[in-house]
């Protein structure tokens, strides 16, 4: 097969590309330039997709012995990921930009261009597995190394996208093994640290970054009864489940800490309450997709496990499609669910699909 290897400049994508070559594929490496911000256009800058990352990717491609290109996807990234991130926070939601990048850039824009150029598949360094069932359908599964499993952030992929995707690291038992393999191959990125920041906010100051773009308008902090108990300097800076940074000048009557329960951008208010009020009995979202054949017909409940964060434990649940939404009821309450988060549903290790959470029903009445 002709394979386009997406090379971020890190160790995972470099080893994935090398394994694709070893498997006998005709491989071409490509690095995606996703930002034109001055802070990313010099060596030593943090985040991903910097000039230094591009240089690391090129060195890896040279060692592996494959052609290498840099493609400018910065405009598409700004529109589909950065602008979406700003819009979601402005609406009082908590988005996951990595999932949006996978959905709109790596497995949409990049894959579309790859197919147009005659490639058969896109290869990445994600830790996930693709399994072909008895009927020849490709299924997305968790990686062998659950500690590094990234199937959650790939939950947005459709069956058509999975048909043209390769994840060579899915069967690798540990990241240490990947680093050892990179060193044995002579790849200089073998000891390169992982990137954990949002790539377009490399200093990690999400609150300050949003304030520059959304603005910071003083508003009220309310308790669950609607009583004003404090003020904030911009509702966009808060997310459901947050405890730190609340400007409340006196303790709650029972002395227990308060947590953000809701962000209301329309009236610029933040609602807080006790930790148990974060327990959620049901979540639902209208923007859902399946990673293959839907597990059940509409209005028919099906058993699954639901995961609402990249490294959260899956929780047994019952889900169904009803009223144009994917509705999920966990067997035990979920904690700290924010609108805008993604709920990925599994059957064992297999990813069934996902939805962006629009609403969350509290398990604790007001």
Curated annotation (Swiss-Prot):
SUPFAM superfamilies: Adenine nucleotide alpha hydrolases-like
Highest taxon in the source lineage: Bacteria
Gene Ontology cellular-component terms listed: cytoplasm
Keyword presence, RNA-binding: yes
Feature type site, description Interaction with tRNA: 126, 341
Alphabetical keyword list: ATP-binding, Cytoplasm, Disulfide bond, Nucleotide-binding, RNA-binding, Transferase, tRNA processing, tRNA-binding
Catalytic activity, as annotated: S-sulfanyl-L-cysteinyl-[protein] + uridine(34) in tRNA + AH2 + ATP = 2-thiouridine(34) in tRNA + L-cysteinyl-[protein] + A + AMP + diphosphate + H(+)
Active-site residues from the entry: 101 (nucleophile), 199 (cysteine persulfide intermediate)
Residues involved in ATP binding: 6-13, 32, 125
MF terms (GO), sorted A to Z: ATP binding; tRNA binding; tRNA-uridine 2-sulfurtransferase activity
Protein name, UniProt field: tRNA-specific 2-thiouridylase MnmA
Gene source species: Leifsonia xyli subsp. xyli (strain CTCB07)
Lineage: Bacteria, Bacillati, Actinomycetota, Actinomycetes, Micrococcales
């Amino acid at each position: 097969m002709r394979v386009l290897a997406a090379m971020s400049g890190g160790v995972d994508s470099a080893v994935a590309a090398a394994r694709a070559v070893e498997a006998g594929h005709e491989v071409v490496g490509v690095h995606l330039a996703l930002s034109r911000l001055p802070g990313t256009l010099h060596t030593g800058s943090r985040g991903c997709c910097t000039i230094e990352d591009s240089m690391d990717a090129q060195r890896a491609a040279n060692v592996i012995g494959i052609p290498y290109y840099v493609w400018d996807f910065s405009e598409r990234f700004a529109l589909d990921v950065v602008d979406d991130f700003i819009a979601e926070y402005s609406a009082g939601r908590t988005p996951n930009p990595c999932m949006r990048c996978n959905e709109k850039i790596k497995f949409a824009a990049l894959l579309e261009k790859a197919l147009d150029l005659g490639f058969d598949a896109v290869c990445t360094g994600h830790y996930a597995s693709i399994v072909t069932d008895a009927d020849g359908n490709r299924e997305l599964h968790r990686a062998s190394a659950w500690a590094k499993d990234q199937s959650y952030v790939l939950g947005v992929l459709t069956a058509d996208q999975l048909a043209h995707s390769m994840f060579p690291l899915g069967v690798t038992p540990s990241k240490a093994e990947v680093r050892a393999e990179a060193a044995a191959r002579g790849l200089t990125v073998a000891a390169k640290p992982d990137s954990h920041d949002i790539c377009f906010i490399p200093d990690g100051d999400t609150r300050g970054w949003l304030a520059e773009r959304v603005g910071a308008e003083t508003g009220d902090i309310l308790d669950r009864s609607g009583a004003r108990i404090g003020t904030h300097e911009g509702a966009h800076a808060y997310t459901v489940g947050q405890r730190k940074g609340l400007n409340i000048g006196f303790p709650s009557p029972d002395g227990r800490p308060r947590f953000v329960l809701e962000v209301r951008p329309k009236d610029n208010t933040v609602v807080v309450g006790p930790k148990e009020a974060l327990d959620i009995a049901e979540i639902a979202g209208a923007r859902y997709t399946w990673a293959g054949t839907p597990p059940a017909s509409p209005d028919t409940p099906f058993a699954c496990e639901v995961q609402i964060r990249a490294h959260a434990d899956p929780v047994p649940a019952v889900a169904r499609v009803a009223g144009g939404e994917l509705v999920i009821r966990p067997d035990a309450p979920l904690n700290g669910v924010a609108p805008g988060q993604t709920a990925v549903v599994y059957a064992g290790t297999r990813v069934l699909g996902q939805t962006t959470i629009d609403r969350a029903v509290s398990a604790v009445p007001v």
